[in-house]
Amino acid sequence: MAQAQPGAAVAATKLPALSHLPNPSPLMKRLGAPLLALPAYQTGTAFADAPPAFTEVGLRYTHYSEDSIDQDVVIFGATDRYDIDVTQLWIEAPVGASWSVALDVQNDYQTGASPWFVGAQQDGAPGVIMSGASIQDNRVEVGVTTRYFWADGNAGVAVSHSDEDDYEATALAFDASWNSADDARTWSTSFSSSRDTLNPTQGVIPVFVTEEDLDTQSGYFGVSQILSRTAIARIGLSYTLSEGYLSDPYKFRDQRPDSHERLSLSAGYRRFLIDSDASLQIDYRYYADSWGTDSHTVEVAWAQNLPGSLLTPYLRYYTQREADFFGVIADTDAQYYADDYRLSSYGAVTLGARWAVDLGESWTLELEAERYMTDADWGVFDGGAAPALVDFWRGTVGIIWRFD
């Protein structure tokens, strides 16, 4: 789980931590960061070396709904795409003066159809053959985190296990943060390892894989620095290596390398504006991998304090270069090939807002709404236009209870 850094008050708010599961299941991979967010514990102002001051219990529900695919690009199959319901329950509590323990339980239920492969229509334009609307999947993840706090920092160990109809994953993670002598700077590091096992289920789509494994290791190092009474900046570098089965067994033309290296550089800036009683939040991320893909993400948010609540509208832009082996219509004569739109060149814009409302001293209501839109022409990289790019809506409601 994420820990607030010294001087975090200048940020006015704190985003949820990313899931401690380093290699999400195929169901969650398609969602990206939005639904990989797990609870942000103890969201009040805190220092990296401060244990939680109270017990926190939270319940959150998220609904994710993809727009139907344009009938003009469908050769065969249903036009409805995925709907996913995510329910999260968590509890974190102090244990003694220097420890805390947290339990996370998450359930995801998915229904709908997805692209099976891309072929040529009668006029030669690319068209999509869909899987049919009969896909259903349910995933349950349970995670436990224990954390130790000392005078200048903290360290935590997390273990998680997730299971669904065709996928099982176990992950172990370690993280630590420590402060400089003047508490103006905080260093953070984390390491994680996961073992995933895939057992594809036979259905409407023929599957030619019985059982495959995937191992993933990931490391991160970052630093945050208080720049002034009202400003803080951070920078971080992460590296991830996955080895094993990385193709998508539910796609007809998909043969990917059995190794995938990823490198990302992230930076952020928070400035509290006293006169406005709000903070400006700017985040940037550069990503590159061994498949030839690289991407840029920029997010700008405005966290506005209101009477009894905090409202944070945000705008995010994403652009991606296509993988070396991507083709709008896959070239099956090549060693590696894929027509998965997620490996294509495109751009995406996200508009959203988060609203946290205090309901008395012990309760907080969380609301969030987001619209995600993609287009091949919105990206800055050249490449073929995949016909199955996805747009979606996402809505979240949550309630948090804190008590001594």
Which residue stretches match the model-derived regions?
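Outer-membrane beta-barrel "beta-signal"
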Residues: 389-404
